[in-house]
């Protein structure tokens, strides 16, 4: 009985600590200032919707670098990386990432679909080309989005998602970004076992964090 009581106390203490950590994170996320704005990213992407996606992406990258110097990866670090998650497969090109925000280009050359995942982050996508279909939890009908449309996936929400081949979009996420990695990498680790992609993903995220650190220190006059 003493052993069981000790285990129960440790479990209760662990849950209490976890609850405190979660509350501290929630407070931090709601009170901190952010570099990017969801509406601004969506508006920038919408201006280039319907264009050839490669041309559109190039123009969007140029505009982001003008508005946010030191926060967008240089061309030599940009890389298209496969993403397997929730049963679907796509490709992403990460432009910016920190602990609380990211911007990436995303799309697929083939029809694909599956589960959206449930995140501790708000995520928005603006369609450049193709079509995106979303079926929200608790509903019986899906909705189709076209070039220029923006889809907002709020924290805690789960949906069924489907991209037609040739769909490309600009994505912005805000929240505790490391919490999204579990879903984003689970299929890669336990299903495809594509450890090259796993390495590429961690490497590009690390490069983004290093860029943010360097820019922060430069602004303080320490680098």
Curated annotation (Swiss-Prot):
Residues 176-223 are annotated as: C-terminal hydrophobic region. GO terms for biological process: lipid transport. Keywords: Cytoplasmic vesicle, Endoplasmic reticulum, Lipid transport, Membrane, Nucleus, Receptor, Transmembrane, Transmembrane helix, Transport. Residues 98-105 are annotated as: Important for ligand-binding. May function in lipid transport from the endoplasmic reticulum and be involved in a wide array of cellular functions probably through regulation of the biogenesis of lipid microdomains at the plasma membrane. May regulate calcium efflux at the endoplasmic reticulum. Sigma receptors are classified into two subtypes (Sigma-1 and Sigma-2) based on their different pharmacological profile. Belongs to the ERG2 family. The C-terminal helices form a flat, hydrophobic surface that is probably tightly associated with the cytosolic surface of the endoplasmic reticulum membrane. This is Sigma non-opioid intracellular receptor 1. The gene is SIGMAR1.
